[in-house]
């Protein structure tokens, strides 16, 4: 059977690299949607490494200028696809809260949505794909196309993380194993908690994340080269790509200067103010903060993006003899930390202690009575240390009897009481891990992403950069073994879904 496959091409190039090996491994027609900047676009227009039957350049089809949205069309679209457009749009980091360069109007946002929807409908109607290969859906327009594929029963092949260390899986839904429906029938391997914790320790990604953060931004030479290239460029992307609207050279330089100042001030505040020593023998609930402006919050938990408000709700819901220990996420450094006003707001909440990002998460989990998380890995890690957890998003491990998902904030107080009295059983966790072992594979996504940033984007300092086939060939050779492994995992899922 000849498969029709649409591939989402972005600046990390992972899906493009997989496509290179995939085209020679199965009988398929490859199509692509390229979401790229102006300087990357010529590479995809002229490349000869992957035989794409057709490539649509997303940004070429989208303009927010002087457009009046067709509300009737969008209204009908929502009914057909059962997609809440405003829920996606209001959580788009480019549209609201996190954009320092351009304030999008209602008409601009809805015009972008209308053009995106029409383009995606056109592509799906023309190709009628069997599969869609994508990265995790970090931006709303990719999430939109992803949801449209699910509605049309197109199988999605998404590289994502199973919330367990240096590993990955290719699944239809983000952070949810495809075999999750088999949980009840999956047999435990009879591993006790000590054996399960040994399994976890072998996978732990703490060092990998720290290395990624250390490499973030590259070398001083990378920063200087990126600045020089940017200042000498025509900066055409600022006019053609809506995520870059308002990013004039002067405003970018100003913003970078202010960011560097804020970064130093905030880091100093974090080091001086956030707690590094606490009494772990007291009764406490542990809440690890998620990184703001990330998928985990904006798409994974769209109704729970205000973490400070969540902290207030938790404190209001605690039994009288409990405290809330909150830990800052080390990854927040990549976003220049939080504002001093946000830190003041958090630390002013009574019965709450804000921990320094260097404090051991494992110690906090081990000594807590309950872990509450928006939807990251901490809720799953809690089970390894015999602790119940509460989450706010749909995620694979919520099948565990010791994991409780909040879908109505009014239920939080009662859910906390129930969770605190819930015992964690090793056989429940072992069944879930046994299920995961059938899907996950070894893959350090942080290291791979860092390598691509170093090799293509000057350490991540310049994403609107010129790319050559010579660079891509070098990456294909250097990472051949890893990329073939990723390709094989995609083929496994293609074969699996084809038999259904």
Which role does the model predict for each range below?
Residues 1-12, 35-36, 105, 133, ...:
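Nucleotide-activated donor-dependent transferases that construct or modify glycoconjugates
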Residues 190-247, 268-274, 409-500:
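C-terminal amphipathic helix plus adjacent low-complexity
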Residues 8-25, 303-318:
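Histidine-anchored nucleotide/phosphate-binding helix
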Residues 118-182:
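Conserved nucleotide-sugar donor-interacting segment of glycosyltransferase catalytic cores
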Residues 312-356:
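Catalytic donor nucleotide-activated moiety binding site of glycosyltransferases and closely related
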Residues 12, 134-135, 160, 356-404:
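A donor-sugar binding/catalytic signature common to diverse glycosyltransferases
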Residues 21-120, 164-267, 488-499:
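Conserved N-terminal ligand/cofactor-binding loop architecture of enzyme catalytic domains
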Residues 279-315, 322, 328-332:
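Active-site donor-nucleotide binding/catalytic segment of nucleotide-sugar enzymes
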